[in-house]
Amino acid sequence: MTTYSSRWNMDKKNDAVNCPLEYGLKIFGGRWDSKIICLLSERERLRYKEIREDVNNITDQALTSTLKKLINDGLIERFQYSEIPPKVEYALTEKGKSVIPIIRSICEWSESNNFGDLNPCHICELEHDKV
């Protein structure tokens, strides 16, 4: 039997993670998670302001909490430089990069099963170019 560390077993609402699918969705299935992962996969290292400008309609509070969550989940790294003014950059970890094929599959599925107009992200465009 596979067990996950205690930090994954319960969230703020006391919902148990019962299977690998739930774990995966909990890790990268948040509203902004995949958008930030897509952005970092395209541009590799970005500062907070650059992420804020490129992710439409995200508030500072939502961006800050999403970045913290992605760091805690091991999907992104935070690089802080000893400069004035302070310089901080974010980049995908190997674990974060491992999510990209999953997101590509979701893009492909969505494109095949949606009859509306969708604006593809960088990862979706890469998948579309392969076809």
Which stretches of residues belong to each language-model region?
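Basic, amphipathic "hinge/linker" alpha-helix immediately C-terminal to the N-terminal HTH DNA-binding motif
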Residues: 82-103
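N-terminal intrinsically disordered/low-complexity leader segments
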Residues: 1-16
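Amphipathic alpha-helical dimerization/coiled-coil segments
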Residues: 2-6, 97-131
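Residue-level recognition of specific faces of alpha-helices
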Residues: 24, 36-39, 66, 98, ...
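Non-catalytic interaction surface on structured domains
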Residues: 23, 27, 52-54, 78, ...
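Canonical helix-turn-helix DNA-binding module
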Residues: 49-81, 85
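N-terminal helix-turn-helix DNA-binding core of bacterial DNA-binding proteins
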Residues: 15, 19-62, 89
